[in-house]
């Protein structure tokens, strides 16, 4: 699956963080030529030539793994919202309030969300893998349980910037009155040039598992796991002493 830089940085359905309409041409033209180059040079099939942006697809590896690959950039993604709360030494962060809580905001779009839910709920494979582009786990600059506002988040380009959409995926994983919970789900991610592993909890800073929280010692409260793979040659976090990793673990116990 493509990253945003096959077109330009932090792309969404109708634009990007560093695309200026007119001065840099038309967004539609930029997407079309970028995807043409991608499909011509990458060893991947074009799922639908009439809709080149729509490249979500699935693979079955016997009864061992069912792999769903998601498209999160160009088909339906809502525009990223800005992070406007300054954190000394860390840059800007944001709280999940206001427009961040709008359920209409999406990474996948209604059609792809329904497709993913159906695949997860009906898969007979032992493992359900999801390959996708941006970190699903919460990544906080300040930790707090949901009952206290949830804390502050670093990156609104990730699923943190689309909390209602992420909750809809969690609802599929947890199951409901008519659908069983989805077990053995693993999310595989790229994007941020560094390696991470996380339990996936909706409320990781809440230690009370009875109220939907998460126990880092036992993993109770985790509904899936995520592995984020590093880049091949692009630089990642410069953290030779491990200070950044220690800080992040202190406010993100699910890592």
What are these regions (language model features)?
Residues 1-255:
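Long, structured stretches of catalytic cores involved in phosphate-ester chemistry, encompassing
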